[in-house]
C-alpha cells in the first residue's frame, strides 16, 4: 500500500464501472456515511468469495446503520457481476480490470502473475473518504472479522454523528428548539436520503 495511505489521509476518489457498467465515484457511493471498502482479488479466489459471503450478513446491518459497503476487484464487468451475484451480495461491486487502483495504490500481488490481482485489503473510511483503518488481507486472517468491522464502525460513527449520544443536555435543547440539523439526516429529508442508497 502506498506510504501516504494511512489513517487520517484522504483515500483517492476512484471512478470505476460497477457491476452494471455504470460509472461510479467512491465519494458518490459513500455520500455522508462511513464506508467499508473491500479491495478484492476477484471472484476466482476462494478466500475472497468466503469473505464476501460473510459480508452479506453484515451488509444488512450496515444498511440500517446508514453505512456503506463497496467492493473493487480486478475482474472485468461480466466477472464482477457474476462474482456479486454468486455470493448473494446487494452492494456495489466495481471493476478495475485496467488495474488503475492496483497500480495507483502499489498493491499488485506479484506472487500471482497469472491473475495479476490486487493484494486484498479492507479499508474503513470515515465520511469524506478519510482513512480510519486499513487491513492487509493477503492472508485470510489478516482480514477483519465481522465483529472487528462493527467495532471500527462504532468508533467512526461516534466521531462523525453529532447525535451519537442524544442524552446530552445540548442535544435535548437543540431538539426542543427545532434545530434538526444536529439529528440524522442532518438537514435533509428522509426522502432525500433514499436517493443516496444503493
Question: Language-model segments: which ranges?
Answer:
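Chalcogenol-based redox active-site neighborhoods
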Residues: 1-198
Amino acid at each position: 500500500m502506498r506510504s501516504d495511505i494511512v489513517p487520517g489521509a484522504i483515500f483517492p476518489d476512484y471512478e470505476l464501472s460497477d457491476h452494471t457498467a455504470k460509472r461510479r465515484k467512491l465519494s458518490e457511493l459513500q455520500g455522508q456515511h462511513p464506508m467499508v471498502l473491500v479491495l478484492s482479488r476477484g471472484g476466482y479466489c476462494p478466500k475472497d468469495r468466503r469473505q464476501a459471503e460473510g459480508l452479506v450478513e453484515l451488509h444488512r446491518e450496515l444498511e440500517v446503520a446508514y453505512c456503506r459497503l463497496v467492493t473493487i476487484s480486478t475482474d472485468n464487468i461480466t466477472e464482477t457481476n457474476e462474482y456479486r451475484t454468486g455470493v448473494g451480495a446487494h452492494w456495489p461491486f466495481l471493476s478495475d480490470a485496467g488495474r488503475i487502483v492496483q497500480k495507483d495504490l502499489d498493491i499488485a500481488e506479484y506472487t500471482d502473475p497469472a491473475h495479476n490481482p490486487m493484494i486484498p485489503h479492507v479499508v474503513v473510511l470515515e465520511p469524506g473518504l478519510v482513512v480510519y483503518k486499513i487491513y492487509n488481507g493477503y492472508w485470510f486472517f489478516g482480514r477483519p472479522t465481522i465483529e472487528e468491522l462493527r467495532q471500527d464502525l462504532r468508533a467512526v460513527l461516534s466521531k462523525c454523528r453529532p447525535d451519537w449520544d442524544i442524552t446530552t443536555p445540548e442535544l435535548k435543547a437543540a431538539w426542543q428548539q427545532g434545530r434538526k440539523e444536529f439529528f440524522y439526516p442532518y438537514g435533509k429529508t428522509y426522502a432525500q436520503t433514499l436517493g443516496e442508497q444503493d
